[in-house]
């Protein structure tokens, strides 16, 4: 995403959607706010910009550029992620179950606010 700013600013965000979801781009973005005891700091430039957008606003997106692919195997896969870092994991998991109709075991675990969550066997 490119913020409308006198100086061009670029940020890398991971796509959260998978190809079967159609002609759209889904991103997981957390607005970067200053810590409570450091409110004099500026909020995140790009995340604040994204959260200020309204339906119909135009943005520029390029990519994808990453090399994070699903291994073509029948072995169990374990996904571990946290926060906005769950975006590419969501893409993989939805692709596995909605496109490939996988039957392999794919446990996924995520961390939010320092607490680990996942399947009961964890």
Go through the PLM ranges and name each one.
Residues 1-55, 112-114:
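Ferredoxin-reductase
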Residues 15, 86-100:
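Histidine-anchored nucleotide/phosphate-binding helix
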Residues 19, 70-72, 100:
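Short, flexible hinge/linker loops that cap or flank conserved catalytic cores
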Residues 52-59, 67:
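Well-ordered alpha/beta subsegment
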Residues 59, 102-122:
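Reductase modules of NAD(P)H-dependent flavoproteins
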Residues 62-74:
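A short, basic/flexible loop-to-alpha-helix module at the beginning of a structural domain
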Residues 74-75, 95-105:
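Conserved S-adenosyl-L-methionine
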Residues 76-80:
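Conserved beta-strand elements of the Class I
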């Amino acid at each position: 995403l490119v913020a409308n700013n006198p100086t061009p600013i670029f940020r890398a965000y991971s796509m959260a959607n998978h190809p079967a979801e159609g002609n759209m781009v889904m991103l997981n973005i957390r607005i970067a706010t200053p810590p409570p005891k450091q409110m004099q700091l500026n909020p995140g430039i790009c995340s604040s910009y994204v959260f200020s957008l309204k339906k119909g606003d135009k943005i520029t997106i390029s990519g994808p550029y990453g090399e994070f692919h699903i291994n073509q195997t029948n072995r169990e896969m374990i996904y571990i992620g946290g926060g906005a870092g769950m975006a590419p994991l969501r893409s993989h998991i939805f692709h596995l179950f909605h496109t490939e109709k996988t039957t392999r075991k794919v446990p996924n675990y995520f961390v939010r606010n320092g607490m680990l969550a996942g399947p009961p066997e964890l």
